Swiss-Prot record:
GO biological process, any: translation
Ribonucleoprotein among keywords: yes
A GO CC term attached to the entry: cytosolic large ribosomal subunit
Family from the record: Belongs to the bacterial ribosomal protein bL35 family.
The organism's place on the tree of life at top rank: Bacteria
UniProt protein name: Large ribosomal subunit protein bL35
Bias (Basic residues): 1-15, 23-42
Keywords attached to this entry: Ribonucleoprotein, Ribosomal protein
NCBIfam families the record matches: rpmI_bact
Keyword Zinc: no
Gene Ontology terms for molecular function: structural constituent of ribosome
Amino acid sequence: MPKAKTHSGASKRFRTTGSGKVVRQKANRRHLLEHKPTKRTRRLDGRTVVAANDVKRVKKLLNG
């Protein structure tokens, strides 16, 4: 059987932590930030853990 390839789109969007959690960037912080409140842009900063229902699917794409 051939080697499984990592899904290149998923590898750019998700990372696995040392403890095995899958993390992602938060949405709505790319552009058009001028009219969004500073409070909202701060809240959308940084990474967050992927929802429990999606973890299995994402790990499969990452061959994890």
